[in-house]
């Protein structure tokens, strides 16, 4: 039972998220042989003020 965790910044549409989990499921199934119904994809969305790169919050990057 493959489990895929994806952390991403919030803001994508429901359609984009549906397409993402479908594509990830298909790729994992193709490359592992696991049936799609046994593949779990967990999406964790975070706000831009809860994520940083190089010590700079993503929310602060946009303010610059």
Curated annotation (Swiss-Prot):
Gene3D superfamilies with a match to the protein in the record: Macrophage Migration Inhibitory Factor
This enzyme's EC code(s): 5.3.2.-
SUPFAM superfamilies: Tautomerase/MIF
Pfam families: Tautomerase
Keywords associated with the record: Isomerase
Highest taxon, organism lineage: Bacteria
Active site (catalytic residues): 2
GO terms assigned for molecular function: isomerase activity
Family, similarity comment: Belongs to the 4-oxalocrotonate tautomerase family.
UniProt-listed PANTHER family: 2-HYDROXYMUCONATE TAUTOMERASE (PTHR35530:SF1), TAUTOMERASE-RELATED (PTHR35530)
Protein name listed in UniProt: Probable tautomerase lp_1712
